[in-house]
Amino acid sequence: KNDKYFTYAQELKEEPLVVNSQTSFQPMYSPDGKEVAFLENRTTLRVINLKNKQVRTVLDGKYNYSYADGDQYYQWSPDSKWFLAKYIAIGGWNNTDIVLVKADGSGEMTNLTESGYSDNNAKWVLDGKAMIWSSDRAGYRSHGSWGAEDDIYIMFFDGEAYDKFRLTKEEQALLDEEKEDKDKDEKDKDSKKDKDKDDDKKDEKADKPVEPLKFDLANRKDRIMRLTVNSSFLGDAVLTQKGDKLYYCAAFENGYDLWEHNFKENTTKLLIKGVGGGTMFPDKKGENIFLVSGGQLKKIEIKDSKTKPIAFKAEFSYRPAKEREYIFHHTWRQVLDKFYDPKIHGINWAGYGKAYEKFLPHINNNYDFAEMLSEMLGELNGSHTGARYRSASSAPATASLGAFYDNNYTGDGLKIEEIIAKGPLTKADTKIKPGCIIEKIDGTNIKSGEDYYPLLSGKAGKQVLLSVYDPATKERFEEQVKPI
């Protein structure tokens, strides 16, 4: 709590927010920070109040079907009182609608789209006075198989916002000019007042609570507009705060490109090729878009149409045996929750779980692990079951300190026998010399007989802290070096 940024926090404390026997994931804070929404049993939308820890159901799980974890979608309203969510209504689970549901748990909901096509990824825009979403109602589709092209649409919940959105460039310019004149008059009046009172007024304005949203749903179907000029295989989309431009990722040729549609100029242009599909987040000023794609972060500068990678480092302790153990239990539990029927072929799923779990300690690679999982899932005698694995990418290279060690030394640490010329340990000001014992690498003790190579994994070219003992002088000291 004392750190300014979570990213650079020196100490992290984790504790469970929701404790129950149900599968719970995909949390999202409310905009006012008072509550957290999450999915229970993959499809039930629930909310926990952070103050009293009471949990309520907002959208019953019967209104959705989860084919794979992560395929559900919902979003808080700006006033923290409503949700836009995925919803199975008249089109079946392959053609979902968008539902507006009240967050208080009353069950009040409205099917906003009612199209019979696939409507997805609804987002609040224009301060909650409208929503944008993707729909395949106008796109090409494969009638004999799967897949369809999408468009981005907008639906207005407020008549004034709808009228303002449709203003021409000239009409918008006149409106902006009137606003500038009005703001100038107010500024002149404020300048005549006491400065302290003016500051108090600004503080009061800054702390003004978000006004509850009001919806004119009766006229919503007359306030729907198609925003994209042609259907395509779409990624994410972002509407600017002013509502004058739409940025979206679309794939026409090789991969996803970033496009811009200017509503006042009625122009569509390609901004950046090959940005990749993913999720886009605009900054508060609307000057940049942050794209999360393929495990990478990118910053897109809208004005200059430039994209910059955002470098980050997130190290973790890789324990493949523990990872396989987790995946095994996750697989077994998911079958139990989503697929298993006690009457299916007389299968004892609990018994099979215990029987196949015994193989885990004897498996040391993912190829054999995938085979074992496939055999266990095969006991179900059901279609479309099995497991596969991806070949591991190149493991991080093990760095070298540029020294030979005494193989006859049996104590803790690494006793240096020879230092290689022009290596990491030959700095001009170093006190490390043959005969010294490296006791720790980055604070981790080197025990006798233990493999020290993992301590240098991926450390090439990075600062590494060595804790060294010199038996000749009885001195202990620390030095930073860059292994190669």
Description of each model-found segment:
Residues K1-F6, V18-S24, K34-N52, D60-D69, ...:
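A flexible loop/linker signature enriched in serine peptidases of the S9 family
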Residues Q172, S305-E323, T426-K427, K447-I484:
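C-terminal, low-ordered peptide segments at domain boundaries
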Residues S142, K306, A311-E375, E379-L380, ...:
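Terminal targeting/pro-maturation regions of precursor/exported proteins
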Residues K13-V18, R56-N64, M109-L112, M225-L227, ...:
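A short beta-strand motif characteristic of beta-propeller blades
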Residues Y8-V18, L213-S231:
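A short helix->beta-strand "capping" segment at the edge of beta-propeller domains
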Residues P396-G449:
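PDZ/PDZ-like domain segments forming the peptide/carboxylate-binding groove
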Residues P361-D412, E475-E479, I484:
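Extended, small/polar residue-biased N-terminal targeting/export presequences
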Residues P27-E35, Y74-F83, A122-A130, A237-D244, ...:
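Blade-terminus and WD-like Trp-Asp/Gly-His loop motifs, strongest in beta-propeller folds
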